[in-house]
C-alpha cells in the first residue's frame, strides 16, 4: 500500500492547501451534515471509522450533486472518563497500560506521560486530528473545537439558562445510575460495561409471613397478577433480615446493599438460611390467601429483592418450575416439604385474551418446553404472553375491583393501590447487568436528593418532540418507531455531577453539567467556531444578548454590539451564517446513541430553537466487530483508524467499511477480505491508468453495451446514496462495474476510455484519493468538486444489453455441459424455431395467457401447430419478462470466434446435428446445445 499512501498524502495536502472543503454561505442550496464528535479517552477505532466514513461519503456525494456542504467536527472531552484514565495511568494500573499500548497503539513512553486530563486531551486530540486527515475526510477544519474551551462553556451556560427559564430543569429526587467510588451519577460514556442498561421500576408486593411480622417483599413488573399468586420462590442460600422503614424485610444480601442507596432507613438485623422458611406460608396482599414458600435455584439474588412471586397461569417460567418441583422428590425431601403442598398448586387464570384455557400452559406446550432448563423457549413464551396480555388482555371477575379493566390500566391501578395501602413499595433495578464504571466499580441505582434534572417527562415537551419526529426523515425508516417509543419512555435525567471536566451550572457552581447533557445543540456552535478560531470572537464577547441574537434572532443588533463589544457588521455576519446553515439537514450516527444522545438532541433543539431550526433528518448505522468479536476500547480487541490506514491505505479502508454491511446492519472487519479488496482496487487503478488517455474510436454494439451498463450503475448508485445505502452504492459503482469491464475486455472491447470520466466521478465519494490521482491524468480540476454523473436514459441500449447477456449465458451453459463430456471437440448450437420466436414476441408484451393465445391463433402458421403453441406459451408465460429476444443467428455468426475462444470448442451452427429432443427444448434466447 506504500504507493497508495504516497498518492493519498499528496491529495490530502493539495485539498488542505487549496482549502476546497471550507464552506461559507453562497448562492447554492446548502446541506449541513454532522456526525457525533468523538470522545477523546483513546484513539479513534473502527466504530468511528464506519460512522465518520458514511458521513464523509455522503458529504462528498452531496457536494458533487451541487450542494454547498458544511461538514464540521469537534472533540468531546467533558465528564469523568478522562479524569479516571489519568488516575489509572498515574497509578500505573497494569490493565490500563496493557489496553492502551496493545489496542490503542500508544507507545509506552508516551502513555506514561499522560497523568493529567489536560495531557490526555492534548495527546488524543492531536492523534485524532492526524487520523481523521489521513483517511481523507472532507471536513471544514476551521470549525474544530474541544468541549472544555472557554467559549464553548459560555455557549453551554447560555443553553442551560434558556432551559431553566423554560422550566425544563428541575431540582428533585430521582433514581440514577451511580458509582459509589466516584460518588457521582454516571452516564453511558462513563461506563466500561452496561452502557445500554436503563433503570427499571419494580413494584414490591409485601407478603407477610403467616402468624408473624416478617415481610417477604416480592419484586415484580406485573403487579396486576397478584391475584394469581400460588406460591413465592426463594433461592436456597443465605439471605438477610433487615429493618426497612420500621418493617422487617427478608431480602437477599445484594438487595440489602442496594437498599442502602435509597431514601429508606435501613438497618441489618441478621443473616438467615432461607431453607428454614421452606414449606411455611405467607399471606397474599389484597386477597388474603395463604401460599407456600418454595425453593428455586433459578432465583437471581442480584435482581431486585431476590424474592419472587409465582403466577403459573401467566408466567411460563413459574409453571415450568412448579412442574419440575413436583417431580423433584429429592429436593422436597431435603427441605421437608410435603409433596401434597406442591401437588395442590393449580394455576389461577385472571386475564382474558384470545388464548383458551391456561395461557402459560398452552404456550409451553406449543413451543415444546420440557423443563425450566429450556430458557430460550421460556423467554420467547414469556415475551409473547406479556405482549399479548398487556395490549389486549382484560381482567377477569376474580380480580376484585379491577375486573373488566384493560391489563395496561390495571397494572398502574394495582401498583398505586398497593402503595397507598402500605402493601406495596418501589424498587429500582438495572435492566441489564453488570453496570461497571470506568474506574472499575460496580454501579448501583441510587435515589439522589436535591439533584438537577432535565425534565424530559414533561408532557408538553414530549408532545412537541413527537410531533416533530413525524415530520422528520429517519434512515432507516423503521427506526422511527424506536425513536417514538424511547421518547415516550424517557424520564427525567440527572444533568449534573460534582466531579469531572466540563461547564459548571451557572446558577449553582457546585455542580458540573454532565457529558451527555452538554452535547445536545453543539451543531450550532460550529457556526461560531469559525470566528472563534479566527480570533474574531472571544469568550468575553459571548454574552447572553449576543447568543440570543445570533442563534435566536432576539434583540436589537446595536444594543447587542454594545453589550458584547463586537462590531454590528461581525454580529450580523454571524447571524446571517446561522440563518443560512441551520437547521442540520442530516445527523448521521451509530445506533448506540439512539437511546440517549439522539433523543436529547431532538428535545433540546425543540425546546430552544424555533421550529424552522429543528433537525430535518437522522440516519442510524450499525456497529462494527473485529474478526467476529465485539470491539471494546476499554478491554479490546480494537482496530484503530490510524492502524487501518497505515496497514491498508485510506481508500481501501473507506471502501471496505462502506461495503462491509448495509447502513443499518452490523459490520464485521475481516482482514482477509480487506486484503482481497486492496487487490481489486489496485486492478481498478492500473486498468484506468492504462486506458484513460487512449483515443476513442468508432463505437460498436459492445461499446454501446458498456455505456448502457454505466448508465444503469449511475442510476443505481444515486438511488442507493439518496437512501444512504453505501453497500449497495459501492457494489454498483465498483464491484459490478469491474465485472462489466472485465467482460468488455474479454469480448475484445477497445474503447474503455468512453466510460472512465463517469466511473472516476462515480467512485470519488468512496475512494477519493485514487480517483483524484486518476482524474488529474486528464483534467486540472478537483474531481471532488466535479458534478456527480447524471443518469441518461437515452444512453441505455437494451438490445446491446440483451446480446451480451445472451452471449454470457450461452458461454456459461456450454462450459457447464463440457464438464460432463470427455475429450469434447465441438459444440452444436440450435436456436429456437422461428415460430417460437414469433410466439415469444407476442407473449413478452402480453399480460394474459388467454389474450396472448387469442392473438397468436390469428396467425395461420401458428394455428396449424395448435396444441404445441399452447404448451409453449404456458411454459414461457411466467418468466416472459426474462425472455432474451435477440437475433440469435446473427449474434452467433458475428461472435463465433469469441465463443470458440471462451469454450475451447469448435462452434457449428447446424440444427440437424443437435438431437431432436434437445431441439424441442430450445426457447428464444436459450438455444439447444450439444457438445461432442
Swiss-Prot record:
<dbReference type="InterPro" id="IPR009080">
    <property type="entry name" value="tRNAsynth_Ia_anticodon-bd"/>
</dbReference>
<dbReference type="Pfam" id="PF08264">
    <property type="entry name" value="Anticodon_1"/>
</dbReference>
<dbReference type="InterPro" id="IPR001412">
    <property type="entry name" value="aa-tRNA-synth_I_CS"/>
</dbReference>
<dbReference type="InterPro" id="IPR009008">
    <property type="entry name" value="Val/Leu/Ile-tRNA-synth_edit"/>
</dbReference>
<dbReference type="GO" id="GO:0004823">
    <property type="term" value="F:leucine-tRNA ligase activity"/>
</dbReference>
<keyword id="KW-0436">Ligase</keyword>
<dbReference type="GO" id="GO:0005524">
    <property type="term" value="F:ATP binding"/>
</dbReference>
<dbReference type="GO" id="GO:0006429">
    <property type="term" value="P:leucyl-tRNA aminoacylation"/>
</dbReference>
<feature type="short sequence motif" description="'HIGH' region">
    <location>
        <begin position="38"/>
        <end position="48"/>
    </location>
</feature>
<keyword id="KW-0067">ATP-binding</keyword>
<dbReference type="InterPro" id="IPR020791">
    <property type="entry name" value="Leu-tRNA-lgase_arc"/>
</dbReference>
<dbReference type="InterPro" id="IPR004493">
    <property type="entry name" value="Leu-tRNA-synth_Ia_arc/euk"/>
</dbReference>
<dbReference type="InterPro" id="IPR013155">
    <property type="entry name" value="M/V/L/I-tRNA-synth_anticd-bd"/>
</dbReference>
<keyword id="KW-0030">Aminoacyl-tRNA synthetase</keyword>
<dbReference type="InterPro" id="IPR002300">
    <property type="entry name" value="aa-tRNA-synth_Ia"/>
</dbReference>
<dbReference type="InterPro" id="IPR014729">
    <property type="entry name" value="Rossmann-like_a/b/a_fold"/>
</dbReference>
<dbReference type="GO" id="GO:0005737">
    <property type="term" value="C:cytoplasm"/>
</dbReference>
<keyword id="KW-0963">Cytoplasm</keyword>
<feature type="short sequence motif" description="'KMSKS' region">
    <location>
        <begin position="630"/>
        <end position="634"/>
    </location>
</feature>
<comment type="similarity">
    <text>Belongs to the class-I aminoacyl-tRNA synthetase family.</text>
</comment>
<keyword id="KW-0547">Nucleotide-binding</keyword>
<dbReference type="GO" id="GO:0002161">
    <property type="term" value="F:aminoacyl-tRNA deacylase activity"/>
</dbReference>
<dbReference type="Pfam" id="PF00133">
    <property type="entry name" value="tRNA-synt_1"/>
</dbReference>
<keyword id="KW-0648">Protein biosynthesis</keyword>
<protein>
    <recommendedName>
        <fullName>Leucine--tRNA ligase</fullName>
        <ecNumber>6.1.1.4</ecNumber>
    </recommendedName>
</protein>
<feature type="binding site">
    <location>
        <position position="633"/>
    </location>
    <ligand>
        <name>ATP</name>
    </ligand>
</feature>
